[in-house]
């Protein structure tokens, strides 16, 4: 009973102090009253502490000399066991944000409180943080990103808060736009040095949505994004075929960069790494990772420069010949051949006379690199024999596959369970994709038979795993027929009708599956430390 009376007396005393401060014209003359309110935080009364959590922020600005003590008292309140006391203190924090120094400290504390397991408390933290950010974006975001950068235990909670609460209202918060977009870009660049694949995807997705990296941005801006991705791919490290995490990270990062290659970013560093580090040990790479590597390079090959094409063509030709049989065989690795032949066409389109010494062609550009005076007839004979063997094999396998495709619908109709139907449909889909690959191989092999062949350098071929372009509606009006790709000596070909679908697919592919994969053996979080995030499906 005595304790209850003491609590009531303490609460009543605080009410009186609060009323006196509210009515005072010159509050600075009542510093002792404010000190008494601050001291109540150290008392025994829970209700008095809750009331102090309301009164301290209310009069905070009137007593700058007592600001440090008031701030410490508020920090003590959010450490209390009583949930109601903590929530009251959290709600009062935005009222303490009178300058940048206090804002940073409060944002840091609120960032730590994001780890709360109580929904109502976490909701209060979200609202307090957003109120704080709206008051001072720079001073609020900087400590939050510090948690991400330093790898503190609550980093994932902070990232979720940024994703769910901050990023969606960037247009409201980032003003003036150019200055604040640059500020948050610099914060992100420091934070992504050590993140998981899913986290990296989140931050890159956000950066690409900023106006400073928009369609009208200068090419230097696109290159800045490429450099961020290059750093994540660890292109300065020696390639280790046993480091699955690095293989997955390289593949995922290059795919992530594809939309930026399309907009003018340079793929040179990725392609040079592929030539110098990956191709020499390609045979030693695990089979399940080889195809992802080849698909990545294939998708990026249309955006290679002529200089990169000259460097990349020799190893590509060697790999292509390895998987193209010299005579008809039972089957070929159609996925590898499709990728390599697609890469070959797009690179050769950029630098056609490079193929003279590699394949024995007779392409005339008037440059010394034509090497027309040298005899490469054996190369031509070998290459065309391999083309013949590949085509004969593909035609034979395609015929068998076509006959089998007709049986799928019958099998689905006769299937007794949904599980059986699902499996049959899955097999049918795989067969359809395989048929697309075979058709692509035949379409790409045919133009390579001439001494001066036609290299496909436009969007005529849609790789089998990409979204297939829709067929155009029939038209009765006349129109120009599309021109075949040439050796690269004519103006650039018009964009093919499948480009939009392919582009969307590439963007989706770049960002899908980044949270999958096993624990890596590389360095840091997401590279062995947290070890998740860089595997393809």
UniProtKB/Swiss-Prot annotation:
Transmembrane segments: none annotated. GO terms for molecular function: mRNA binding. Disruption phenotype: Male sterility due to lack of tapetal programmed cell death (PCD) and degeneration, leading to defects in formation of male gametophytes. Residues 474-492 have a biased composition (Polar residues). InterPro entries: API5, ARM-type_fold. Keywords: Apoptosis, Developmental protein, Nucleus. Residues 465-537 are annotated as: Disordered. GO terms for cellular component: nucleus. GO terms for biological process: pollen development; regulation of programmed cell death. Residues 9-363 are annotated as: ARM-like and Heat-like helical repeats. It is found in: Nucleus. Pfam families: API5. It comes from the Eukaryota. Putative anti-apoptotic factor involved in the regulation of tapetal programmed cell death (PCD) and degeneration during anther development. Interacts directly with the DEAD-box ATP-dependent RNA helicases AIP1 and AIP2 that form dimers and bind the promoter region of the cysteine protease CP1 involved in tapetum PCD. Interacts with AIP1 and AIP2. Belongs to the API5 family. This is Apoptosis inhibitor 5-like protein API5. It comes from Oryza sativa subsp. japonica.
């Amino acid at each position: 009973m005595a304790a209850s009376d003491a609590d009531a007396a303490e609460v009543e005393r605080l009410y009186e102090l609060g009323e006196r401060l509210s009515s005072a014209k010159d509050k600075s003359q009542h510093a002792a009253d404010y000190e008494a309110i601050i001291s109540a935080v150290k008392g025994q009364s829970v209700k008095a502490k809750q009331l102090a959590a309301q009164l301290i922020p209310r009069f905070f600005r009137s007593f700058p000399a007592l600001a440090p003590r008031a701030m410490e008292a508020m920090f003590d309140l959010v450490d209390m066991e009583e949930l109601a006391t903590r929530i009251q203190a959290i709600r009062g924090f935005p009222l303490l944000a009178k300058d940048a120094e206090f804002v940073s400290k409060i944002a840091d504390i609120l960032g730590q409180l994001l780890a709360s397991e109580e929904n109502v408390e976490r909701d209060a933290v979200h609202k307090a943080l957003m109120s704080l950010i709206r008051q001072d974006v720079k001073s609020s975001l900087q400590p939050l990103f510090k948690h991400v950068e330093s790898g503190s235990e609550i980093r994932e909670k902070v990232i979720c808060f940024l994703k769910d609460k901050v990023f969606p209202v960037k247009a409201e918060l980032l003003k003036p736009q150019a200055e604040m977009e640059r500020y948050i870009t610099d914060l992100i660049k420091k934070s992504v040095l050590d993140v998981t694949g899913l986290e990296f995807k989140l931050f890159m997705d956000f950066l690409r949505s900023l106006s400073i990296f928009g369609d009208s941005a200068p090419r230097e801006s696109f290159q800045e994004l490429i450099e961020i991705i290059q750093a994540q791919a660890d292109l300065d490290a020696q390639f280790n075929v046993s480091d699955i995490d690095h293989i997955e990270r390289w593949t995922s990062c290059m795919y992530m960069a594809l939309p930026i290659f399309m907009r003018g970013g340079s793929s040179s560093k990725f392609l040079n790494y592929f030539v110098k580090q990956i191709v020499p040990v390609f045979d030693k790479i695990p089979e399940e990772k080889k195809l992802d590597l080849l698909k990545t390079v294939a998708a990026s090959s249309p955006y290679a420069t002529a200089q990169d094409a000259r460097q990349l063509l020799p190893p590509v030709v060697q790999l292509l010949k390895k998987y193209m049989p010299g005579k008809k065989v039972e089957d070929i690795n159609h996925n590898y051949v499709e990728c390599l032949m697609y890469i070959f066409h797009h690179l050769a389109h950029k630098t056609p006379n490079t193929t003279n010494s590699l394949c024995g062609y007779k392409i005339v550009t008037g440059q010394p690199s034509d090497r027309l005076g040298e005899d490469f007839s054996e190369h031509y004979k070998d290459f065309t024999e391999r083309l013949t063997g590949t085509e004969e094999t593909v035609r034979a396998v395609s015929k068998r596959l076509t006959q089998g495709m007709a049986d799928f619908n019958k099998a689905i109709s006769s299937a007794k369970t949904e599980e059986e139907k699902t499996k049959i449909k899955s097999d049918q889909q795989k067969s359809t994709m395989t048929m697309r690959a075979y058709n692509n191989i035949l379409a790409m092999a045919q133009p390579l038979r001439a001494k001066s062949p036609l290299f496909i350098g436009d969007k005529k071929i849609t790789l089998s795993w990409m979204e297939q372009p829709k067929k155009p509606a029939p038209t009765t009006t006349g129109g120009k027929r599309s021109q075949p790709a040439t050796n690269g000596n004519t103006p650039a070909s018009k964009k093919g009708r499948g480009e939009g679908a392919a582009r969307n697919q590439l963007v989706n592919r770049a960002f899908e599956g980044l949270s999958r994969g096993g624990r890596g053996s590389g360095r840091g979080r997401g590279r062995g430390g947290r070890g998740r995030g860089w595997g393809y499906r």
